[in-house]
Amino acid sequence: MSQENVERLQAVYSEWARGNFRPGGQLFAPDVAFEALTDGRAAIGRDAVEGYMREFLAQWTEFRIEAEDFVEVGETILVTERHHGTGKSSGVEAEMTVYSVWTFRDGVVVRVRWEIDRASPLEAAGLTE
């Protein structure tokens, strides 16, 4: 199942790299925990995740996420991401590397967490560098 989970995430990230953030919701469990990087708050449930993403994306004139690497350990997948965006109010272009940990259970995502530091997600996934 874990390789199938990686392939499903790769398809989602392929769309996210184009700035299309609609794909992905079908992967979430009804009570998914979505722990954002920007403000530390968590969105619980599909509707809350959708609302959070709408609010987040409204801050950008252009935003996309490219996946650079997928590391799987059981039902946990660590993704190295490259975020690109242009701020709506500032017009400033931003780019940064971010790490996400996707936890699957029975083929659906039950938790996603983002970090700036690679060590924390590696530890959460049971890996070391």
Where are these regions (language model features)?
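A short, polar/proline- and glycine-enriched secondary-structure boundary/capping micro-motif
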Residues: 89-92, 120-127
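Short beta-strand edge/turn micro-motifs at domain boundaries
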Residues: 99-123
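A solvent-exposed, acidic/Ser-Thr-rich amphipathic alpha-helical stretch
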Residues: 4-7, 14, 21-75
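Exposed beta-sheet edge and beta->alpha loop/turn motif
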Residues: 82-105
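A short hydrophobic beta-strand element
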Residues: 74-83
